[in-house]
Every structure is written in C-alpha cells, then in structure tokens.
Amino acid sequence: SSTDAATLASLFSRPARGRAVPAWSLAADEAVVTALGNDVGFELIFSRQVIAHSRPMDIAIALSTSGNSDDLIVALTEAKKRGLLTIGFAGHSGGSMSTSTDVDYCFTIHSQSIHRIQESHARVGYRLWSVVQEQTQQRVADLMAAGPTNPGGSS
C-alpha cells in the first residue's frame, strides 16, 4: 500500500498530462517514518505528519488492503479533526476504515486477494485523478468564458 500511495501521489503531483495538484505520500520519507516510529510509535507516523503539514481544504487519502491499519485509522481521525476531507481505500470487508465516522468516503474492494485489491485501488485512484482533472479543466474553461473580472469595481 505504501508503494501504491507513492504512485497515487505522483499521479496527482507530476501527471503526464493535465494540471499538477500538490500531493505527497506520507510514507515516502524513510527518515521521517523511522524517526517518528522510533520516537513516538509507529501507530503515529502518519498522524504526526498530518498535524505538521495539513491545511484546511486538504484531502487525506489512506490505502489499506485490510482496512484495519491502526496507523492509517489514527491519521484519518486526526485529519478529520482538522477539517480535511478523508478518503479510505480498503480491501476485504473494509475493516474499521469502512465503518469509521472519521472517513468521509471509503472505497472497499471486496476480495481476499491482496494483489487484486491493490490493482483495484490503483484503478480507483486513477479514476479519482481523472475526475479531478475533468473538474479542473471545466472550472478553468468556465473562468475563461466569464472573461476578465474588474476587482476594483471601476470602469
């Protein structure tokens, strides 16, 4: 799931086409992950990064093949507390991720096959990216059609 998170973050932040959207995987920096794990506990490695980096209007996405990864559940709880939109990608029956009130949307892949779950998470992630790109393009087109605005109000 860590590799899938890095791939999804890369798709948003460095797309082959379309607009880049700021995104990063909280598992990508081994030094931060191991320092937090050793100093405060591995169940807090992602929530501490949410505290440090999140801003209002951000989106937190967590990927877990079981849906029961404590470190991700704690991070999603922290993200929700901070006002972020929270999205879970889970497998099997969805685990605690699918029933948590701190998860706004949970995409559950009902399979016992880890590789099928991860393949499906990749497809759902790509579709999510596609929707963001479509909406962004439409918003830009709408703004362009509206023409320039006059913020000062004078003619």
Identify the role of each PLM range:
Residues 1-143:
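Glycine-rich phosphate-binding loops that contact phosphosugars or nucleotide phosphates
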Residues 140-155:
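A short, charged, Gly/Pro-tolerant segment at domain boundaries
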